[in-house]
Curated annotation (Swiss-Prot):
Subcellular location: Secreted
S-S pairs: 2-7
Gene it is expressed from: IAPP
Free-text function comment from the UniProt entry: Amylin/IAPP is a glucoregulatory peptide hormone that plays an important role in the regulation of energy homeostasis. Selectively inhibits insulin-stimulated glucose utilization and glycogen deposition in muscle, while not affecting adipocyte glucose metabolism. IAPP function is mediated by the CALCR-RAMPs (AMYRs) receptor complexes. Amylin can also bind CALCR receptor in the absence of RAMPs, although it is more selective for AMYRs.
Keyword Oxidoreductase belongs to the record: no
Native organism taxonomy: Eukaryota, Metazoa, Chordata, Craniata, Vertebrata
Family per similarity comment: Belongs to the calcitonin family.
A matching Pfam family: Calc_CGRP_IAPP
Listed name of the protein: Islet amyloid polypeptide
Species whose genome carries this gene: Cricetulus griseus (Chinese hamster)
Chief place of localization: secreted
Record remark on domains: The mature protein is largely unstructured in the absence of a cognate ligand, but contrary to the human protein, it does not easily form fibrillar aggregates.
Amino acid sequence: KCNTATCATQRLANFLVHSNNNLGPVLSPTNVGSNTY
């Protein structure tokens, strides 16, 4: 697992995107980064 602040933020953003698709366009740049792990 990744414990860095950046990775944690990406994981949180990815969780939010899956929780509420309305946030997808807002978090899309971060979501792309989260998909790399």
